[in-house]
Each structure stands twice: as C-alpha cells, then as structure tokens.
Amino acid sequence: MAQKLITKDDLKAYLDADAKRFGRKITFKDMLLGNDDWHYFWYFRHLRLLEYHLNNKHRVRAIFWTIVHKIECNRLHLNTYPNTIGPGIRFYHIGNFSAIYQNAEVGANCTFLSGSVIGNKGLKLDSNCKTIIGDNCYFGLNCFVGGNIRVGNNVTIGTNAVVTHDIPDNAIVGGIPARIIKIKETLE
C-alpha cells in the first residue's frame, strides 16, 4: 500500500517508478504535440512533490504545490488526494472525470482508464471506512470501487463494473454489482 514520502530517496523512488510506467522518456516534443502522456507525467510529478512537502511540513512549498495540484486537477478532470497512491501509477485518456478519494489506498503499479472512481466522497464517512487496492491492478472505463472493501493484488476490474465487496487476489471481475468472472492462474 501507499507509504508516506518522507525522505528525498522516497521521493526519487516514487518519481522513477511513475516515469518507468510510461515505457519511454517524456520529451518536450510530447508537450508541443499535446500528448496525454506529457500531461499525466507532470501531474504525477507535481503530486509527488506535494506529498513530500506536506509530509515534511514545509508549509510554504506545500501551499504552492497544493495550488498547482488543484489547477491541474481541474484541467485534466482528475481528482486525486495526496498520500493515497502508491508508486508506478498510470492513467490513460484525459477527458472523462476520474477520482481517487481520500479514504482510498492504492497500491503500486496500478492502471486506470478514464472515468474510474475509487473510494467514497461524503460528509459522514466513518474514519474506519477504507477502500484498499492491492498492487498491479487494472481498472476499466467508468468503473466504481467503493465502500469498506479490500481489492487484492493483480485484479482486473472490467468496464462499468461497480465493486462493493472484497475481491481476492488474481481475480477478473465485472458487472453491476461486480462478480468474479474468473481467477487468473499464477505462474510459479
């Protein structure tokens, strides 16, 4: 699960893991062409800087990066809270609103398609109500994962699925409400 970024080494490890998920170096040419990868690369770079400064109580820098983060959230139609996402995150497709709310914990190397919503947003949330996502998960278009649930490692959640109960490791789920379609075979 996501750990807090405290040291410069933690920050560098998260930034390297996020950059590695793009599979190539993000260049100035990507910015000129308006490539989605360029926007997401810088969004997550700024999110990691915000997390680092919040966790180390650098007030002025944290305020600056919070403002930058909010501007980018509105521009990309993407809402993520600091300290909720593990290293190696990957979003695809700018446009449809995606969100990872503050009561969620997302593991490492997760992939989200457009319209994914993780966690709950509400005024009367129980502090013990957490949506916990394992490592190496894949979320299809417009899926919702929320409630006091745990999603295991290596899970694939299909398009338009609504997940409201625990999902074991290596599962493929889909439907409304989501049900297990298949358990992936593991190579050992």
What are these regions (language model features)?
Residues L76-H77, Y101:
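Short coil/turn segments at secondary-structure boundaries
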Residues I180, E185-E188:
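Long hydrophobic alpha-helical segments typical of transmembrane helices together
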Residues P82, G86-H93, S98-Q102, G107-A108, ...:
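Left-handed beta-helix
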Residues I67-R75, Y92-I94, I118-L123:
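Short gly/ser/thr-rich secondary-structure transition/capping motifs
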